[in-house]
Amino acid sequence: MPASRLRDRAASSASGSTCGSMSQTHPVLESGLLASAGCSAPRGPRKGGPAPVDRKAKASAMPDSPAEVKTQPRSTPPSMPPPPPAASQGATRPPSFTPHTHREDGPATLPHGRFHGCLKWSMVCLLMNGSSHSPTAINGAPCTPNGFSNGPATSSTASLSTQHLPPACGARQLSKLKRFLTTLQQFGSDISPEIGERVRTLVLGLVNSTLTIEEFHSKLQEATNFPLRPFVIPFLKANLPLLQRELLHCARLAKQTPAQYLAQHEQLLLDASASSPIDSSELLLEVNENGKRRTPDRTKENGSDRDPLHPEHLSKRPCTLNPAQRYSPSNGPPQPTPPPHYRLEDIAMAHHFRDAYRHPDPRELRERHRPLVVPGSRQEEVIDHKLTEREWAEEWKHLNNLLNCIMDMVEKTRRSLTVLRRCQEADREELNHWARRYSDAEDTKKGPAPAAARPRSSSAGPEGPQLDVPREFLPRTLTGYVPEDIWRKAEEAVNEVKRQAMSELQKAVSDAERKAHELITTERAKMERALAEAKRQASEDALTVINQQEDSSESCWNCGRKASETCSGCNAARYCGSFCQHRDWEKHHHVCGQSLQGPTAVVADPVPGPPEAAHSLGPSLPVGAASPSEAGSAGPSRPGSPSPPGPLDTVPR
């Protein structure tokens, strides 16, 4: 586009209307491009006071401005000579411009807003300062596109920016676009290597013009499963033609096609170390803790759901949601909040261009927003997206080994549970077996078996299981999988059964012994009672006989016939004759012998009487015979009595 034509357009626009004034300060160049495309509604001068120093550009775009370069064919970039310097224009009076409302010059394809304001103001600077103004950044350093630093691309890019782009704007836009594409590719690589490769293919297709912006937008969202912010499509429409023109110019200098040049110099476009990439959370909508998409609050504040793919709906209201307001309390105090109608962080990380509203380091933002973008990753571990294929293979190998270890543990646990279940069934069968044996032993003891057979049968009961226990425990060979507690419990159960059987045996033996002792004691008591009864009966019979003899005073004590004589010693015993007296003397002398000493003491007594008879009877026992004179003298002493036993004692005994 010739410089004279640009001057004519600027003059005609300035004479048509005085809609707003533009300042020449550098913060205007920053704020114009860094505003969100979703907040690109046409605005007039701000009400309620003067606008901030770094927020001023609010005019519409000029016809045929560099912002509309996308309407030109991509294959034939315009080649124009550098415009001559305009010495007649002064820098003290800011020119005024009217919005572009005439459709005869061609439709304006970008929404009216800060994109056009920045580009138009850059064109004003170009018209006022001439072509001698070199593309510099705000701090005075030369502003060249990031990523192209060697070879003929550097000089060609610098010349392209000097000849066809606004000063301090075109190079910065190219740098922002490259950082944007680099951030997309790194975000895809953070998710997975496959998604990163797909995103890289989409980016190369977009730059090579094989994909339209809408197709790139839809396929990118389909590949990453994350919605992009509404400003992405207007940003690409505004800046992608600049990158394609630069690529075409560099390809012509290298005598190659754009596709060949991009294939050979792909690292210049997607070089992560050449520029600081944009935080992916600024390009993507936020997600909640469950990893699902969350509709932004700004799309539902007015009660209507708007499609993020249509920025014209979002341009009807100012954007008030700032990422600085989304910081959680755990991330520290938020940064100072810019005015609500600016979205300085929506397009790029341009913190080195701003002095009043400085943002944190991109690494800090990446670490803060990474749990929102990739919910599956750990917050304390930052994924290195510069891993090589070998490192990724190592990571996958480690993950595969981990999964194999987990599977082995699960398999071993399952086998252990199976073995434990089998052992539990075997223990249950064994306990049932012991219970049956114990019940059989109880039934046997309750039966009508004799007392002597009961200990024998009960003793044979526990001894049999004791011999069977080793045979029942021998078949178990899976001791490696059975814990010691199982065996210990089984042994305790067997020992408990043994102890109960032994206690029952001891109880049965003690009962038998007690009953035997009781039986012996009972028999002994019976014998003693029988003997005592016999003795008592004999003594009673003897006493009865004695009593009968004592009561019968007229019968002989020896033969029971009628007595005719009386013993001279006791005067109680009655005999029928001397023969019976001598026959009964063996028994009678025990009674009568005590009174024999009495007659011996009174032998000298001349008085005839019973002592004399006793004296005559007493000496007759030891001597064996009595004199007839003594017997004769004793006879008349007891008149009326039978003949004395003296003559009877003469009979040899």
Swiss-Prot record:
Query: What organism, scientifically named, is this protein from?
Result: Homo sapiens (Human)
State which disorder the record connects to this protein: A chromosomal aberration involving CBFA2T3 is found in therapy-related myeloid malignancies. Translocation t(16;21)(q24;q22) that forms a RUNX1-CBFA2T3 fusion protein.
| Tissue distribution | Widely expressed with higher expression in heart, pancreas, skeletal muscle, spleen, thymus and peripheral blood leukocytes. Expressed in hematopoietic cells (at protein level).
Q: What does the UniProt entry list as the effect of changing E518K?
A: In a colorectal cancer sample; somatic mutation
- Pfam annotation, one family: TAFH
Q: Where is this region: Required for nucleolar targeting (in isoform 1)?
A: 1-127
User: Under which name does UniProt file this protein?
Assistant: Protein CBFA2T3
Q: Which InterPro entries match?
A: CBFA2T1/2/3, CBFA2T3, NHR2, TAFH/NHR1_dom_sf, TAFH_NHR1, Znf_MYND
Complex formation? Homooligomer. Homotetramerization is mediated by nervy homology region 2 (NRH2). Can interact with RUNX1T1 and CBFA2T2; heterotetramerization between members of the CBFA2T family is proposed. Component of a TAL-1 complex composed at least of CBFA2T3, LDB1, TAL1 and TCF3. Interacts with ERBB4, HDAC1, HDAC2, HDAC3, HDAC6, HDAC8, NCOR1, NCOR2, and ZNF652. According to PubMed:12242670, may not interact with HDAC6. Interacts with PLXNA1, PLXNA3 and PRKAR1A. Isoform 2 interacts with PRKAR2A, PDE7A and probably PDE4A. Interacts with ZBTB4, ZBTB38 and ZBTB33. Interacts with HIF1A and EGLN1.
Bias-annotated ranges (Pro residues): 75-86, 331-341
Interaction with HIF1A, as annotated region = 176-268
Record region (Disordered)? 1-109, 284-342, 434-472, 603-653
For the site labelled Breakpoint for translocation to form type-1 RUNX1-CBFA2T3 fusion protein, the residues are A51, P52
Query: PANTHER family of this UniProt entry?
Result: MTG8 ETO EIGHT TWENTY ONE PROTEIN, PROTEIN CBFA2T3
**Binding residues for Zn(2+) 2:** C567, C570, H588, C592
Q: Nervy homology region 3 (NHR3): where is this region?
A: 485-533
Q: Which UniProt keywords apply?
A: Chromosomal rearrangement, Coiled coil, Differentiation, Golgi apparatus, Membrane, Metal-binding, Nucleus, Phosphoprotein, Repressor, Transcription, Transcription regulation, Zinc, Zinc-finger
Q: What does this protein do?
A: Transcriptional corepressor which facilitates transcriptional repression via its association with DNA-binding transcription factors and recruitment of other corepressors and histone-modifying enzymes. Can repress the expression of MMP7 in a ZBTB33-dependent manner. Reduces the protein levels and stability of the transcriptinal regulator HIF1A; interacts with EGLN1 and promotes the HIF1A prolyl hydroxylation-dependent ubiquitination and proteasomal degradation pathway.
Q: Name one GO biological process term.
A: negative regulation of DNA-templated transcription
| Residue numbers spanned by region Mediates interaction with PRKAR2A | 485-506
**Where does the TAFH domain lie?**
171-266
Q: Where is the composition biased (Low complexity)?
A: 11-23, 447-462, 622-638
Q: What induces it?
A: Down-regulated by all-trans retinoic acid (ATRA).
Task: Tell me which residues bind Zn(2+) 1.
Answer: C556, C559, C576, C580
Give the domain section of the comments: Nervy homology region 2 (NHR2) mediates homo- and possibly heterotypic oligomerization by forming a four-helix bundle tetrameric structure.
List all membrane-crossing ranges: none
